[in-house]
Each structure stands twice: as C-alpha cells, then as structure tokens.
C-alpha cells in the first residue's frame, strides 16, 4: 500500500524502494473467510516472519497448529508449511494443494487492491490507514459471502 512517508523503515522491496505499509491477513483454509488482520507495519522494518511473531497471530493459533504460508515465512517448519524447494512425487500433491490455498488468499488480496484507496498513494495518518484497510476488508468479506464467492479448495490435512 503506497504511502506519503519517506525513509528506509517504510521502503518496500516489492515496490522497488517506494514507501509502503504492510498488513498481515489470515484466511481460513476451509471457508475462505478473513480471520485475522494486523497492521499497519512499516514495510522496510518488518518482515512477514517478524510481523507474525510480534504481531499476535503466533499467540492466536492453537499450540501445534501449522499455517500454510509463502516463502516469506521459511525458517520455522514447526509452525509454517511453505512450498517445497525440491519436488518429489510424494510432496507434489501437497505442494499443488498448497498452491490452490495460496491462490485463494491471493484472490482476497486482489479484491482488496481493487479499492483505489489501497492501491493509490495515501496522504493521511497511518492509524487512519488501518481503519480504512479494515473497512475495505469487511466489504470484501461481505462480497464473498453474498454473491462473489471464492473457489472451493479440497484440503487434506495429511502433511
């Protein structure tokens, strides 16, 4: 989410050094509902893994529960299931299932970005950005529940 702030702590690698904010969004695997939103965080200062550990989601999940995640969370295999680096026949099915789950999460992200206020430069207080982000997330969730559903994912918990 581009913002008006300047400096290294806001610089986003994804946006080639432009200032931005990060949010942590968790989507339930079985229903596709947005279950957790945390942020805003300064893009250059907080990695995905740091946001997870310091932002509260780590303490909100059940002990022993594993989270489907992308490569930004590599390094904690007891908590995260990230894509396999080397595919074998045994883990190919699990990897394909995970890609479908991540694709559905990316669909939520794309729907959030359809709102210009999250796509364009933001020039107001960062706290207000958090309010706006959450309001947009509620609108996206309402749309998922009432006529624009996500595609189904057949998820097996045998990894």
Regions found by a protein language model. Give the residues of each.
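Short, well-ordered secondary-structure "scaffold" segments embedded in the functional core
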Residues: 1-159
């Amino acid at each position: 989410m581009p913002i008006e702030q300047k400096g290294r702590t806001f610089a986003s690698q994804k946006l080639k050094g432009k200032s931005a904010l990060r949010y942590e969004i968790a989507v339930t695997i079985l229903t596709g509902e947005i279950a957790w939103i945390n942020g805003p965080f300064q893009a250059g200062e907080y990695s995905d893994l740091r946001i997870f550990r310091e932002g509260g989601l780590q303490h909100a999940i059940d002990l022993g529960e594993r989270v489907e995640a992308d490569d930004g969370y590599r390094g904690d295999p007891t908590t995260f299931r990230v894509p396999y680096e080397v595919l074998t026949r045994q883990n190919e099915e699990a990897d394909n299932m995970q890609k479908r789950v991540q694709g559905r999460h990316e669909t939520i992200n794309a729907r959030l970005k359809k709102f210009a206020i999250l796509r364009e430069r933001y020039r107001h207080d960062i706290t207000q950005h958090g309010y706006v982000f959450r309001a947009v997330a509620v609108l996206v969730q309402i749309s998922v529940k009432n006529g624009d559903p996500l595609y189904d994912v057949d998820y097996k918990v045998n990894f």
